[in-house]
From Swiss-Prot:
NCBIfam families: nodulat_NodB
Broad class of where this protein is predominantly found: cytoplasm
Domain NodB homology: from-to ranges: 21-213
Source organism of the structure: Bradyrhizobium sp. (strain ANU 289)
Major enzyme class: hydrolase
Protein name: Chitooligosaccharide deacetylase
Record's keyword annotation contains Cytoplasm: yes
Metal-binding in keyword set: yes
Record-level Gene Ontology MF annotations: hydrolase activity, acting on carbon-nitrogen (but not peptide) bonds; metal ion binding
Length: 219
């Protein structure tokens, strides 16, 4: 029987670990050749870092985007190899999903050293946490989810984040789609709402006194 883990047992925010009003931008389900470059362009324009939780099968096809992420100061993190519901996987499958994804990341860019892992769909089990820990990966969930994947509109994405943001918050956004849904992301318009929202959101957060930082490395 699968032992599910309550969300309070998984990292959802970082409090105020730096003594500043820090917040953390994270992106799931890339890299995607149509969407990810636009996200990176906005981050570069505003000179802020982010963490990209990437899917290993996409990494193998888009190594240049992984190298660009690292070159521009972003963290590349583990979102498994094929984005399955890990609660339906045997322990050996969980192990393979996590470790193979980390290998794919390092193969694409040896300078990329994954330090964090996020379970697909945010479904955590004891096997997932144990495997992540053994692989040296900190398990990270999120505390702010504007559901940008559903394309609710740019204004809704921005307002949802600003209404929920707190010091230490981890914001969930998307720069791609999971395997099986990738046909939904065949041009730059697929995540255009996320990209446009991001261009408004970053200065709005900064005006409110928040600082955008990389996810902390916990020892």
């Amino acid at each position: 029987m699968t032992e599910f883990i309550p969300l309070f047992a998984v990292r959802r925010n970082y409090g105020d670990v730096s003594g500043t009003r820090s917040v953390y931008l994270t992106f799931d389900d890339g890299p995607n050749p149509f969407c990810t470059p636009d996200v990176l362009d906005v981050l570069t324009q505003h000179r802020v870092p982010a963490t990209f939780f990437v899917i290993g099968t996409y990494v193998a096809n888009q190594p240049e985007l992984i190298r660009r992420m690292v070159a521009e100061g972003h963290e590349v993190a583990n979102h498994t190899m094929t984005h399955p519901d890990l609660s339906r996987c045997e322990p050996a499958e969980v192990h393979d999903e996590v470790l193979t994804a980390s290998r794919a990341i390092r193969s694409a860019c040896p300078q990329a050293l994954p330090r964090h892992m996020r379970a697909p769909y945010g479904i955590w089990t004891q096997d997932v946490l144990a495997t992540s820990a053994k692989a040296g990966l900190a398990a990270v969930h999120w505390s702010v989810d504007p559901r940008d994947w559903a394309r609710p509109g740019v204004d809704r994405i921005v307002s949802s984040v600003l209404a929920a943001i707190r010091p230490g918050a981890i914001v969930l956004l998307h720069d791609g789609y999971p395997p099986g849904e990738e046909r939904s992301c065949t041009d730059a318009t697929s995540r255009d709402q996320t990209v446009r929202a991001l261009s408004y959101l970053i200065p709005a957060l900064q005006r409110r006194g928040f600082e955008i930082h990389p996810l902390p490395q916990l020892h």
